[in-house]
Amino acid sequence: MPVRRYGGRYNNSSPGVSNALSPSTTAGRPLSPSPAAGSKLASTHHDPVPQEAYYVNDEADAWHQQQAPFREPSVEVEVEMIDDEPPHGSQKSLSVAPYTANASSSSGRSKRNAITASGYTFYTNERQKTVYEALRSLRPLAELQEPRRVKEYAETSLKDSLYRIIEAHDVIMVAGAFFGDEGKGKTVDAVAHHPLCTCIARVNSGENAGHTVYDKAGRKFVFNLAPSGLLLPGKRNYIGPECVMDPVSFMEKEIIQLIDAGIDYRDRLFIGNVCIVTPYHKLLDLLGSAANSSTLKGMAPVHGSKVMKRGIRLDHIFNDDETLRKRLEKDMDTYLGLLKVKNLSDADVVRLCREENSDGVVRVPDYVIAFAQAKDKVEFLVKLYRDRVRHNPDFPARCDVTYELHAAVLRGEKVLLEGPQSYWLSNARTKFWESTTSADTTAAGLLAASQLNFQKFKSVVLNVHKAPGSSRVGIGACPSSFVPQDYFSAQNIKTLRDLPSETCANFEAVQRTLFRDGFPHSNDKARHNGIMAPVEYSDETGKYNIGVAMAIASAQHHGECGAVTKKPRVCGFFDCVLQHEVNSIQGPYLTISALDRGDEYDKVGVTIAYVYYNPEGKQVDVNGHVYKNGDIIRAGDPVPSEPALYHCHPIVKLIDGWRDNPIAAAKRRRNAPLPRGVCELLSTIEYFTNCKILSIGNGPNGDDIIYLRQ
């Protein structure tokens, strides 16, 4: 496994960085060497598994006969949140099951050593300290003193802020500005409540995106593809033809919630001719994806079928079975071919599926496993779609979504495009291309997928980010993260339950250690250069590198994990380098969610630049520019791609917190002046990104938003 480290600069080389570093070292973060012997690290799902004796159904009907006609009697309605509203303020620490270790030493040390066998470490080693000694000589950037003037932000009303923007445009897009999970739902809800906003649409991506919404009665609904406006009376909701849908999962996990709640959706939800995610797409995802690299929702395989024009769309299910059979048979060649190449039997696939579900989290549904067992797989699918979709009286109405959205705008109505994932997770962004989703989830991708006339209709983008605790889930580079993106998965930590009990559970102590010891010259402007020192945090369970401690503590304290899977997201500092490009491409408006978290921080960190440092001294050529050790990448410079970003370290500006003047909705007096720390944070973000901050989130409720006067 390659060393994945962070930091960089586009043009100016800093003379203050030493090159005298041993290979495979990194400042302030755990190393990522090749897995040690006996490692738990499962690099991919590719390896063939031994043959085992499994009972495989000879008839496809055997499974179907056991099922209810249109829904299973027991349906899990809560799914993993890929883009959930981030929790706010103080969160009760998640219950974490103890980690069982074989070592006989003290409980904390034995637990830690059992996990570090993967090659990563919880503690700081000597090589990390050596690297920090080189980077600490970096001359402080003048930008660390910016902005020279802190703006004063005045609160205004929803009507004088957001509603004015809505009324000046025809198409409103709410888009993620980082790597998903930014808390877009609250902004979507605010826009959807505008009386002129009659249409809410999801126009691309699939069930790998998600959001939680609540109705007036406080009932919780977890949606993936279903638009948020379904709970608002008088709103029409659409799922466009560029979306990809597993219709069985859609009915069992999303529509069933509406049925059980007695919500009539028949005249308010319409589905276009979507591409169909089949069970073999999900199995291809399982068999071909590295650990932690996929949601196992079949996204890459189904988009491959779409591009190759081999898959099926919803209309195929509602027409003759013979055409459906032929298309399924042709498209399934990829799946059957992979089994042959990997020398896998159906029983092997079933075993892998059950292993994925062995911790109690259903990542592979029963009907997908039943497909893997079926002898006649094509006939299994034809019957599945006939019973669960075509003949299902609960399946929503279908329509030409593009036509309906166009007609609505011509009538003077407003259309809200609900963006899945985010700008940097878009497959159209080459910088993170290998670790993105498979759709273009930028604002440009949303508008293109909607097929609304961009020359005729006025559109606006509301970008959403969160702070503190910006996060990314899955693999890939993320310079401002506290640990590498594969840190948890490399140690076989699929959920927060896999962490030792009470590990870094005292968030207050962890963050205090970070800002007190991790930035030793934070109060000395002449010496503070923004490089985080590899100090350690200790508790009763052991000793931890401060980056590791913050990653664990943030995930637990802020609830940064999947709602059901508990898969931890990797948190870090707000990244102005990446945010600058987002606002330069998608427009100036930015809303920051969950800012009330800052009520519990001594200081808040903001990444204003990267320093490139490859411990092996290697240079990286990106778009014709060669990055070398000591180069600085500032906000506004071209963002390099992942081969360079893996060796980029954040340069962090620290801002004093506002503990004595909390902004959480439950504690703040309405229209009270914002604390200086909040104003300095917002001023810093605006200065380095050229954005206009429209609002900040300050609580869990839908109306816990502070709108700022422009």
UniProtKB/Swiss-Prot annotation:
Chief localization = cytoplasm
- PROSITE patterns on file: ADENYLOSUCCIN_SYN_1 (PS01266)
Tell me, what is one Gene Ontology molecular-function annotation carried by this entry? GTP binding
Task: List, from the UniProt record, the residues annotated as the active site of this protein.
Answer: D181, H211
- Tell me which InterPro entries the record gives: Adenylosuccin_syn_GTP-bd, Adenylosuccinate_synth_dom1, Adenylosuccinate_synth_dom2, Adenylosuccinate_synth_dom3, Adenylosuccinate_synthetase, P-loop_NTPase
Biased composition, class Polar residues, residue ranges: 10-27, 101-111
Record's catalysed reaction(s): IMP + L-aspartate + GTP = N(6)-(1,2-dicarboxyethyl)-AMP + GDP + phosphate + 2 H(+)
Task: Note the superkingdom of the native organism.
Answer: Eukaryota
The protein's location, in the record's own words, is:
Cytoplasm
Q: Which GO terms describe its biological process?
A: 'de novo' AMP biosynthetic process; IMP metabolic process
Q: Which SMART domains match?
A: Adenylsucc_synt
- For the ligand (GTP), the binding residues are G180, D181, E182, G183, K184, G185, K186, G210, H211, T212, R569, G697, N698, G699
State its Enzyme Commission number(s).
6.3.4.4
What is this protein's function? Plays an important role in the salvage pathway for purine nucleotide biosynthesis. Catalyzes the first committed step in the biosynthesis of AMP from IMP.
User: In its UniProt entry, what is this protein called?
Assistant: Adenylosuccinate synthetase
Organism from which the protein derives: Leishmania infantum
